[in-house]
Regions:
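Primarily recognizes the serine-hydrolase "nucleophile elbow" in alpha/beta-hydrolase
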Residues: 1-44
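Mobile cap/lid helix-loop segments that gate and shape the active-site cleft of serine hydrolases
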Residues: 7-8, 39-76
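Acidic beta-to-alpha connecting loop that harbors the catalytic carboxylate
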Residues: 34, 90-92, 122-124
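Short beta-strand/loop motif that positions the catalytic acidic residue
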Residues: 80, 85-88, 92
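Conserved alpha/beta-hydrolase "acid-adjacent" motif
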Residues: 93-102
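Catalytic histidine neighborhood in serine/cysteine hydrolases
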Residues: 108-126
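Catalytic histidine-centered segment of alpha/beta-hydrolase-like enzymes
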Residues: 123-136
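Catalytic active-site module of serine/aspartate enzymes centered on a nucleophile-bearing elbow/loop
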Residues: 133-159
Length: 159
């Protein structure tokens, strides 16, 4: 969801009743995200779309295809995207790591802001929930350093 928020800033489709509000974000840090809600190709994709149809959108993709496109960060990459730090566990069995790689590549192809991608070795989905683990600790530290860099860069530009 953080990717979708970052890539739909000021999009009136997603802010009914407050279309004039600034909904931009300074940076995005998606972790093990699902960036493509449309493609049925690849490991776990058909099951994911079935899950979306039954529990999330509650509408069939064949009848409401645009809804799925609109909810897919992969189809919303844009030149003015904020800086991104994309993290994905290399051993994620719920969302294959390839999806993170493809999203990072697509975003790098168009964005003028930095796009950082990190694959966490031997990490499963939700690897960051194990707060006592070294993997979670170092990942949190890397996120903090990235966000501090974004903030410092923004301050320098403002001066």
């Amino acid at each position: 969801l953080s990717s979708l928020v970052a890539l739909t800033a000021d999009d009136p489709q997603f802010q009914p009743g407050f279309e004039d509000a600034d909904t931009s974000v300074v940076a995005a840090v998606p972790i093990y995200g699902r960036y493509d809600w449309v493609s049925a190709r690849g490991s776990g994709r058909k099951e994911f779309i079935s899950f979306l149809q039954k529990f999330v959108t509650k509408t069939p993709i064949v009848q409401h295809h645009q809804l799925y496109v609109d909810a897919s960060p992969l189809y919303r990459v844009r030149a003015d995207a904020p800086p991104f730090f994309i993290l994905h566990g290399r051993d994620d069995s719920i969302i294959p790591v390839q999806e993170g790689r493809e999203f990072a590549d697509a975003l790098r192809d168009v964005s003028t802001a930095p796009v950082v991608y990190a694959e966490i070795p031997h990490a499963q989905h939700a690897f960051d929930f194990y707060y006592g683990s070294p993997r979670a600790h170092y990942t949190a530290q890397a996120v903090e350093e990235f966000l501090s860099w974004v903030a410092a860069t923004a301050r320098r530009r403002a001066d």
